[in-house]
A protein has these predicted regions:
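Conserved catalytic-core segment of nucleotide-activated headgroup transferases in glycan assembly
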Residues: 138-200
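A short, active-site helix/loop in glycosyltransferases that binds the activated sugar's phosphate group
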Residues: 105-130, 169
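Membrane-proximal helix-turn-helix segments that form the acceptor-binding/catalytic region
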Residues: 89-110, 119
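Active-site proximal beta-strand in glycosyltransferases
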Residues: 47-49, 65-94, 111
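Carbohydrate-associated surface elements
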Residues: 116, 135-139
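N-terminal pre-catalytic "stem/leader" segment of glycosyltransferase-like enzymes
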Residues: 1-55
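Short amphipathic alpha-helix with an adjacent loop that forms part of the alpha/beta core around
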Residues: 36-44, 60-63, 198-199
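Alpha-helix capping/helix-boundary segments
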Residues: 55, 78, 116-118
């Protein structure tokens, strides 16, 4: 995984906690720190769960594919150059836009977040190892916190997540609010609970992700 605390990373954290509570030994490695030596040392004892591989070096990806048992926990569409299937008719990208096909094909399983997510991945990669988890993972603590926030007073503004990541599409949300003459509040990512608390202080959220 990577060190950035976003939705995918929080989901990874809960997933690891569940595995740990069920008696499994979990070793976490940031994607950019994964090496061939780490793979070689652990390939017999561990099954690798790859949640983010964009910062893994190509030779290390080859080592994973050829030497180890691994599962891909897919949070978006990293098999596409654009990572955005919505750009293409019926969510099906041209063949020249596909990447990492062999990496997905060699996995024991590719775990997707929903049945729609699974269908889109399957449509593009044409593989039979793709599965839907039917949702994301949440801790009881976070769910209780969100329920508590839902009861608070709201300002008549729109929350917009401030991000320079292209597929978060902050500019699209701002343009929409300006077009509709809606007041908005740009909220920069921070500590997770502080961030969702800030989001919850407004009546609505405007978000047009590109993936």
């Amino acid at each position: 995984e990577d060190g950035i605390l976003g939705g995918g990373e929080l989901n990874n954290h809960i997933f690891c906690e569940i595995l740990h509570k069920r008696g499994h030994v979990v070793r976490r490695v940031h994607s950019h720190e994964l090496t061939r030596d780490i793979i070689e040392e652990n390939k017999q004892e561990y099954c690798f769960i790859i949640a983010n591989f964009l910062n893994i070096k190509p030779d290390v990806i080859s080592a994973i594919r050829n030497l180890t048992r691994y599962v891909i926990y897919e949070h978006d569409h990293k098999y596409l150059k654009t990572r955005n299937p919505a750009l293409y008719e019926d969510f099906q990208a041209p063949a020249d836009q596909l990447v990492y096909h062999d990496f997905y094909a060699s996995a024991l399983a590719v775990l997707c977040q929903s049945s729609m997510h699974k269908d889109i991945v399957e449509k593009n990669l044409k593989l039979n190892n793709i599965h839907s988890l039917s949702g994301n993972l949440w801790s009881t603590d976070v769910l209780d916190f969100i329920e508590e926030l839902s009861q608070g007073e709201k300002k008549p503004e729109c929350s917009i997540m401030e991000s320079n990541i292209d597929h978060k599409n902050t500019s699209g949300a701002v343009k929409y609010c300006i077009l509709k003459n809606m007041e908005y509040d740009l909220i920069a990512p921070s500590d997770y609970k502080k961030f969702i608390k800030r989001l919850s202080q407004n009546e609505s959220l405007v978000f047009f992700p590109k993936t």
